Swiss-Prot record:
Function: Thiolesterase that catalyzes the hydrolysis of S-D-lactoyl-glutathione to form glutathione and D-lactic acid.
Protein residues bound to Zn(2+) 2: 57-58, 127, 165
Entries under CDD domains matching the protein: hydroxyacylglutathione_hydrolase_MBL-fold
Coiled-coil boundaries: none
Protein name listed in UniProt: Hydroxyacylglutathione hydrolase
Oligomeric form and interacting partners: Monomer.
Catalytic activity: an S-(2-hydroxyacyl)glutathione + H2O = a 2-hydroxy carboxylate + glutathione + H(+)
Amino acid sequence: MNLNSIPAFQDNYIWVLTNDEGRCVIVDPGEAAPVLKAIAEHKWMPEAIFLTHHHHDHVGGVKELLQHFPQMTVYGPAETQDKGATHLVGDGDTIRVLGEKFTLFATPGHTLGHVCYFSHPYLFCGDTLFSGGCGRLFEGTPSQMYQSLMKINSLPDDTLICSAHEYTLANIKFALSILPHDSFINEYYRKVKELRVKKQMTLPVILKNERKINLFLRTEDIDLINEINKETILQQPEARFAWLRSKKDTF
């Protein structure tokens, strides 16, 4: 399979996974126009859409795409039923698309019904995990989001994290505000700055590398714990996650 990305809105990525025959699955099409343009340019044959959650910038293009390709199956959690989903999916489900098996797991936090789609090495994680960060808690609790991130963190080292937004630079600036002397984060910051100056995307990222620079995956890291302890003593990693998320919300 081949991974492709389509920029949308200000900072969204619509991921498109294609096979050698040109059949494809489209992930979180927030708008239809750029997808239709890419389909025409590459002569792709859309087979399915994956929806991770109900927010408009992830589902806004579904109904128009279905008008052009009514044969498509649209997979999504229950919260996307009125957004164009034709087949509802949830935690533990497996589906076969493009001849490949995808496993779904619930990742509540950003929204209560958020799901991720995984077919090694590709993880389509919507707004749950970003490079250097994680999604805002619009509906879920810090505990829910922490558990969702731990599910992702348990995946193989070579998992490709296909997040839905280009938030990396801002996330790494936040990480440096907490751990300014961390060598991994500083090195990644320089790399990300260079990419963004050239208008190049920073995604996808490899989970093994993400574990080194994403503070939300490092809640048991001694350097981070020592930094948090300067302000408050938090014994549980979930509590440290909540502290981090609160800091990021006002950064």
